[in-house]
Amino acid sequence: MKVFILALLALTATTAIAQLETTCSQGFGQSQQQQQPGQRQLLEQMKPCVAFLQQKCSPLRMPFLQTQVEQLSSCQIVQYQCCQQLAQIPERTRCHAIHIVVEAIIQQQSQQQWQEPQQQAQHKSMRMLLENLSLMCNIYVPVQCQQQQQLGQQQQQQLQEQLTPCTTFLQQQCSPVTVPFPQIPVDQPTSCQNVQHQCCRQLSQIPEQFRCQAIHNVAEAIRQQQPQQQWQGMYQPQQPAQLESIRMSLQALRSMCNIYIPVQCPAPTTYNIPLVATYTGGAC
């Protein structure tokens, strides 16, 4: 009996996902043809999550079951499939996979529903749903997955120049200013404090969706100024101390600047630095 029930539930969930596949293929149109093979594969893998987040599943009515038997629904089955698929995706790719899920749902909504001012409410609702994936699946999902937009070489250079104060501060290439009037009971500002203020001010002027990339540029600038032998190979013995030093410096941004910075910035593949930066209260 239990085998029959589980088989029926699985069949229902499969039917729901099959219907979703038809909807997806109609909703994407030409944009789906432009997707890269990796994106199409991720979308196929994440279709249970799309179905669950859209609640395109309804409880199964089985009046023949006894009341003490758990009434599993097709949503529960799809939820399980969503978590199972998400767990199989590497952590570094989950943020991209979540964006694909959001994009799939947006594509299936009528364009009128995504116009201002309704757009902000829709995005807020979607963000809350995605944040629940972490608890629902009991796996790590980035709390805030910022849309990773491609920047041109000129924009990359501008970002790096804009955050030169941050590079200077994180490297502590500033020294206290000598004030010849120590008897004056006034806080003695240092050049480091001035650079810190400039860093926070520059970072606050960068749009949120580019701050993660900006932080990478800072780390890259610091890396390039280190002796090359310290950065050869991802697992060189002398490298962990350097990586930990930079990671701790980047974490200092959370208490240094009172602005939003992505909770976890995926590290570039060229140098696997676990960049982590959030914000807490406190002005520059």
Swiss-Prot record:
One example of the protein's molecular function in GO is:
nutrient reservoir activity
> Per its UniProt record, what Gene3D superfamilies does this chain match?
Plant lipid-transfer and hydrophobic proteins (1.10.110.10)
Per the UniProt entry, the signal peptide is: 1-18
Keywords linked to the UniProt accession: Disulfide bond, Seed storage protein, Signal, Storage protein
| Entry coiled-coil feature ranges | none
Keyword Signal assigned to the entry: answer is: yes
What the entry lists under Pfam families is as follows:
Gliadin
Provide the record's note on post-translational modification: Contains disulfide bonds.
Q: What are the disulphide bonds in this sequence?
A: none
Query: From which domain of life does this come?
Result: Eukaryota
What task does this protein carry out? Seed storage protein. Might be integrated via inter-chain disulfide bonds within the glutenin polymer.
Q: Which family does it belong to?
A: Belongs to the prolamin family.
* Stated name of the protein: Avenin-like b3
Q: Which organism is it from?
A: Triticum aestivum (Wheat)
